[in-house]
Amino acid sequence: MELENWLLKYNVKKMTIDNYNNYIKSYKLEEPEDYAKVFKDKDITKIDIVFHSVSYVINYWYVDEYKYISAKLRLKYDGCGFAEYEAIYDMNGITEDDYFRKI
């Protein structure tokens, strides 16, 4: 399957975790109040970061077609998911955007 080849070629799991680590460092420095609300009194060493899903997406914006790969990590604490990180990659493995949200 082409998606599986793409995932192997770009090592999407490692790439997504690396991007998450960079994102979270910036988030903590640039948005300390928001960071504190999301992570509250959680012991950071006990947070499980789980590779949750990856998908090939085709979106239509007016008449334009936009194809990309979405990779998601789920953050769990005491077995419960509390946040999600999503990275968007173009078809050449370049990071286009990323999102972090509380769930």
Regions found by a protein language model. Give the residues of each.
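N-terminal trafficking/processing presequences and adjacent post-cleavage segments
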Residues: 1-39
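Glutamate identity and glutamate-enriched acidic tracts
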Residues: 2-4, 30-33, 65, 84-86, ...
